A protein has these predicted regions:
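Cofactor-binding active-site loop characterized by glycine-rich and histidine/acidic residues
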Residues: 14, 24-154, 172-178, 183, ...
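Residue-level marker for buried hydrophobic side chains located in beta-strands
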Residues: 133, 160-161
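Flexible, glycine/charged-enriched surface loops at secondary-structure junctions
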Residues: 15-17, 130, 219-223
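N-terminal glycine-rich anion-binding loops that anchor highly charged ligand groups
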Residues: 4-20
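Thiamine diphosphate
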Residues: 162-230
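Loop/turn elements at helix/coil->beta-strand transitions in domains of secreted/extracellular proteins
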Residues: 156-157, 219
Length: 230
């Protein structure tokens, strides 16, 4: 159930926070606590054959897409039993069997991967879709514009999901963006742009359902802006 998925994400993150705080996890962790409704509501509409790309704050996406919790935690600990044999760590968790193309330490690094995955799906004439999760800071990277433009031109089955937690590290969105909302940027690329309360699980689920079904039908990409906080 979606409730269990949200609980699994929060429980996973609380454990990650604890072990990081006592120095047992190498490197750094960016926790998804508080944003669980977005990954859960979106991924509830996906299958194992659908692809997602994630962010440096990506544990929640991987859990919601069906990633193995024990192997994920092993990866964060740098163990050879992890999904990436302990080589990727917190910011590079991937599981191709579940369609998880990877969390990404590069801000905005998932745009090209998701667009490419969607191009693959269209070329092979499948009804699989790709979903790109990204933060508000990534919306100001050049490849945001490039990939949304390509997705529109080629009518690709991809859904861009902006998790707008209002701050890119410590920079507020109003200070870094000329447009009042990220969703309205979709107009420039002739695709639907939808704004939703990212704390409302059922609202996110419904908006994502419409976007995913649109992509599966071959009607092209959608940009979703989910307002949340971390």
């Amino acid at each position: 159930s979606m409730y269990k998925t949200m609980w699994d994400i929060r429980n996973f993150e609380e454990n990650a926070r604890h072990f990081f705080s006592i120095g047992q996890i190498p490197g750094f962790v960016h926790l998804y606590s508080g944003e669980e409704a977005i990954a859960t509501g979106v991924c509830a509409n996906l299958t194992d054959k659908d692809y997602i790309t994630s962010t440096h704050r990506g544990h929640g996406h991987c859990v919601a897409k069906g990633g193995d919790l024990k192997k994920m935690m092993a990866e964060i600990f740098g163990k050879s039993t992890g999904l990436g044999k302990g080589k990727g760590g917190s910011m590079h968790i991937a599981d191709l069997d579940k369609g998880i193309l990877g969390a990404n330490g590069m801000v905005g690094g998932g745009f090209g991967l998701a667009t490419g995955a969607a191009m693959r799906n269209k070329y092979l004439k499948t009804d699989d879709v790709a979903v790109c999760f990204f933060g508000d800071g990534a919306a100001n990277e050049g490849n945001f514009h490039e990939c949304l433009n390509m997705a529109s031109i080629w009518n690709l089955p991809v859904v861009f999901v902006n998790e707008n937690n209002l701050f890119a590290e410590s920079t507020p969105q109003w200070y870094s963006s000329g447009s009042p909302t990220i969703a309205e940027r979709a107009q420039a690329y002739n695709m639907p742009g939808v704004r939703v309360n990212g704390k409302d699980l059922f609202a996110v689920y419904q908006v994502a359902k419409e976007a995913v079904e649109r992509a599966r039908r071959g009607d092209g990409p959608t940009l979703i802006e989910a307002i949340t906080y971390r």
